[in-house]
C-alpha cells in the first residue's frame, strides 16, 4: 500500500495509507521513525559518486575563497581603523585646546573677581553700609533700611528716644492714639501685647497699624504674575504714547517708565480736563459685590466699572479693549472693522518691558483691573497733594525733624551739609511737580527694584490713612468746614478689626486664624480705601480742604515738608518730655 501525507484537503483513494498532520507539529505530518534512513535515500547517494565528489569540490573551493577574502580584509583592517579614529583624535585635540582656554579664562576670572571683591570691600568700607537706600526730599540725605522701610523707620524713632517701647515721650497724632485706645477697649484679648501704660503709644501697635495700611492695596485672593502697580504704570505709559507720539521720551526698561510717571500723569490729567465734562472717580457700587472686592468668575456685572472716569478714558484711548457687552453686535462690527479693537495693548507692553512669559488680560481679570484703576487714581491724588509743595519753608514750622532722629539714633552729630532739612531761604518757591518727580526717581523706583511685587499702598501708607480718614470727613460734613475731630476711631472699625487679627496672628499659629474672616475684613478695608480715594479726588482743592478742616493735624502734619514725609512713612513722630 502506497503511503500519502496529507497537508490540505484529504481524499481517500483506494489502497492508500494516509498520515494526518497534528497540532503538535503544526503543518508537518507525523513521519514514521527512521523515515529518512530508508534504503531509498541511502541508495540514491551511493548510486551517484561523481555528484558527491563535485559537491565536495565546490565546498572546498568556497572555503578557500572565504579564507582569501578574510585574509584580504585582515590586511586592510588597520588602515580602516586609522581612517575612522583620525577624526576622533582631531576632535579630542580641539577639545583639549578648548579646555585649556577655559582653564586660562577661569584663572583670569578668579583673579578679576578677587580684584572686584577687594574693590567692593573697599567701597563698602567707604560707604559703611550695603543696605538699600531711598530719598524722599531733595534737600535731605538718603535713608537706608533693612526690609520694610516704614517699619524700620518706626524702630529708629523708638531707638532715638533711647527707651525703646517703654518710652511715653513719642506721639504720632490724635488719629493713631484714638485707634490704640479703641483697640484696647474693644479688643482687649488682641491688645495684650500692646504696652499702653502711662499713655504711651506702643511700638508693636504702630508697626502693626502701618503694616495694615500697607496691605490695603494688596489682593489676598488669587495668585497673579503682575501687580496692579505695574499694570497702572503700563496703562499710563500707553495713554501717553497715544496722546504724545511725537514727544515720546526714550525708555528702555520698566524703571525708566517709573521715572517718567509725572509726565504720564500730567498728560492724563490734561486729557481728563479737556475731554471730560464731569469726572467721576467712583464705580457703580450697585452692580458690585457689597462686602467683597474679588470678582466671582473674574468679571463683575456689566457696567460696574465703566462709570469710573479713569476706566472710561482708558477705553476711549484704546489702551484697554472695550468692556464685554459694552456695544451691541451691530455697533461692535463697525468699531472692530479692522479686527484690532480687542487687541490688548497691556499684554504687548508687559511682554516688552517686564518679559515674564505670562499673560495679562485686564478685561478678563477685572479684580486686577479694578485695583489697577484704584492705583492710577491714587497716583493722581498723590500728584495733587504734592503739587507746588514748598519743602524749603521755615524749619520750626515742621513737626518732622529728620536730623534730630538720625542724630539721636546713631549717636553722631548732625551734619548740616548732609541733613539740611527745610532752610527757609526759598519760602516762596513753587515746586510744581518737582516733588513728585523726585519721589518717582529716588523713592518709588528703588523700592520697586528691590521688590517687584510691591503695590502703591506699600510705598505710601500715609496716603491710605488719608483715604480711610475721608469717611470721617464726609460724616462730619463738608471737607472745607473748619472743625477739629479727635473721635475718628469710631469710623475705623474695619481697620481696628484688621489690626486685631494681625496682633492675634503674631501670637498664634497661622493655621489657627480663620482665613475667611481675614479675607472678609481685609476686603472691607480695601473697599473703604477705594471709596475714600473717590471722595478726596472729587474735592477741587483737596490739600487746602484738608488743611482748613484740620484733618492733616490729626497726623501731626503741619507743613508741606511734613506732608511729603507723611505720605511716604505713614507717621510723623514727635518727641515729648516725660511727665
UniProtKB/Swiss-Prot annotation:
Task of the protein: Capsid vertex-specific component that plays a role during viral DNA encapsidation, assuring correct genome cleavage and presumably stabilizing capsids that contain full-length viral genomes. Participates in the interaction between the capsid and the tegument through interaction with the large tegument protein/LTP.
Gene that encodes it: CVC2
Record's subcellular location: Virion; Host nucleus
This protein's name: Capsid vertex component 2
Assembly behavior: Heterodimerizes with CVC1. Interacts with major capsid protein/MCP and triplex capsid protein 1/TRX1 at the pentamer vertices. Interacts with the large tegument protein/LTP.
Gene Ontology, cellular component aspect: host cell; host cell nucleus; viral capsid
Family: Belongs to the herpesviridae CVC2 protein family.
Keyword set includes Cell division: no
One record GO biological process: viral penetration into host nucleus
InterPro entries, A to Z: Herpes_UL25 (IPR002493)
Region (Interaction with major capsid protein/MCP): 1-50
Keywords (A to Z) from UniProt: Capsid protein, Host nucleus, Host-virus interaction, Viral genome packaging, Viral penetration into host nucleus, Viral release from host cell, Virion, Virus entry into host cell
One protein family per Pfam: Herpes_UL25
Primary location group: virion
UniProt organism field: Varicella-zoster virus (strain Dumas)
Amino acid at each position: 500500500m502506497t503511503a500519502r501525507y496529507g497537508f490540505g484537503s484529504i481524499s481517500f483513494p483506494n489502497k492508500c495509507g494516509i498520515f494526518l498532520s497534528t497540532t503538535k507539529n503544526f503543518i508537518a505530518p507525523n513521519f514514521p521513525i527512521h523515515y529518512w534512513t530508508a534504503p531509498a535515500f541511502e541508495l540514491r547517494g551511493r548510486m551517484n559518486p561523481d555528484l558527491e565528489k563535485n559537491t565536495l569540490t565546490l565546498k572546498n573551493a568556497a572555503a578557500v575563497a572565504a579564507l582569501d577574502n578574510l585574509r584580504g580584509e585582515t590586511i586592510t583592517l588597520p588602515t580602516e581603523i586609522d581612517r575612522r579614529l583620525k577624526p576622533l583624535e582631531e576632535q579630542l585635540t580641539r577639545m583639549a585646546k578648548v579646555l585649556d582656554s577655559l582653564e586660562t579664562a577661569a584663572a583670569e576670572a578668579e583673579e578679576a573677581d578677587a580684584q572686584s571683591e577687594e574693590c567692593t570691600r573697599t567701597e563698602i568700607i567707604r560707604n559703611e553700609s550695603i543696605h538699600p537706600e531711598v530719598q524722599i526730599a531733595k534737600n535731605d540725605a538718603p535713608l537706608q533700611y533693612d526690609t520694610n522701610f516704614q517699619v524700620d523707620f518706626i524702630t529708629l524713632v523708638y531707638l532715638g528716644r533711647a527707651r525703646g517701647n517703654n518710652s511715653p515721650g513719642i506721639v504720632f497724632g490724635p488719629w493713631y492714639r484714638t485707634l490704640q485706645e479703641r483697640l484696647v477697649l474693644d479688643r482687649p484679648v488682641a491688645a495684650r501685647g500692646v504696652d499702653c501704660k502711662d499713655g504711651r503709644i506702643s511700638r508693636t501697635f504702630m508697626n502693626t497699624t502701618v503694616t495694615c495700611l500697607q496691605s490695603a492695596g494688596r489682593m489676598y485672593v488669587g495668585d497673579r504674575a503682575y501687580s496692579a502697580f505695574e499694570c497702572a504704570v503700563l496703562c499710563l505709559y500707553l495713554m501717553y504714547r497715544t496722546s504724545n507720539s511725537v514727544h515720546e521720551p526714550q525708555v528702555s526698561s520698566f524703571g525708566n517708565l517709573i521715572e517718567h510717571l509725572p509726565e504720564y500723569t500730567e498728560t492724563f490729567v490734561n486729557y481728563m480736563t479737556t475731554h471730560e465734562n464731569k469726572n467721576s472717580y467712583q464705580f457703580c457700587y450697585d452692580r458690585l459685590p457689597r462686602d467683597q472686592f474679588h470678582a466671582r468668575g473674574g468679571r463683575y456685572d456689566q457696567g460696574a466699572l465703566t462709570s469710573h472716569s479713569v476706566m472710561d478714558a482708558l477705553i476711549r484711548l484704546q489702551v484697554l479693549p472695550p468692556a464685554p457687552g459694552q456695544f451691541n453686535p451691530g455697533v461692535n462690527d463697525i468699531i472692530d472693522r479692522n479686527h484690532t479693537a480687542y487687541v490688548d495693548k497691556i499684554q504687548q507692553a508687559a511682554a516688552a518691558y517686564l518679559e515674564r512669559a505670562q499673560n495679562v488680560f485686564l478685561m478678563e481679570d477685572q479684580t486686577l483691573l479694578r485695583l489697577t484703576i484704584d492705583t492710577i487714581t491714587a497716583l493722581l491724588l498723590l500728584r495733587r497733594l504734592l503739587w507746588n509743595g514748598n519743602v524749603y519753608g521755615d524749619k520750626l514750622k515742621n513737626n518732622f525733624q529728620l536730623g534730630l532722629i538720625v542724630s539721636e539714633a546713631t549717636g553722631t552729630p548732625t551734619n548740616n551739609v548732609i541733613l539740611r532739612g527745610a532752610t527757609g531761604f526759598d519760602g516762596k518757591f513753587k515746586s510744581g511737580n518737582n516733588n513728585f518727580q523726585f519721589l518717582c526717581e529716588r523713592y518709588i523706583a528703588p523700592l520697586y527694584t528691590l521688590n517687584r511685587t510691591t503695590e502703591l499702598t506699600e510705598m505710601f501708607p500715609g496716603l491710605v490713612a488719608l483715604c480711610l480718614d475721608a469717611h470721617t470727613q464726609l460724616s462730619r460734613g463738608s471737607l472745607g468746614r473748619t472743625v477739629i475731630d479727635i473721635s475718628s476711631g469710631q469710623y475705623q472699625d474695619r481697620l481696628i478689626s484688621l489690626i486685631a487679627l494681625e496682633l492675634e496672628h503674631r501670637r498664634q499659629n497661622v493655621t489657627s486664624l480663620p482665613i475667611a474672616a481675614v479675607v472678609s475684613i481685609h476686603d472691607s478695608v480695601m473697599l473703604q480705601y477705594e471709596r475714600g480715594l473717590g471722595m478726596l479726588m472729587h474735592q477741587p482743592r483737596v490739600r487746602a480742604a484738608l488743611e482748613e478742616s484740620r484733618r492733616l493735624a490729626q497726623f501731626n502734619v503741619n507743613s508741606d515738608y511734613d506732608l511729603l514725609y507723611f505720605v511716604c512713612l505713614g507717621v510723623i513722630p514727635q518727641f515729648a518730655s516725660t511727665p
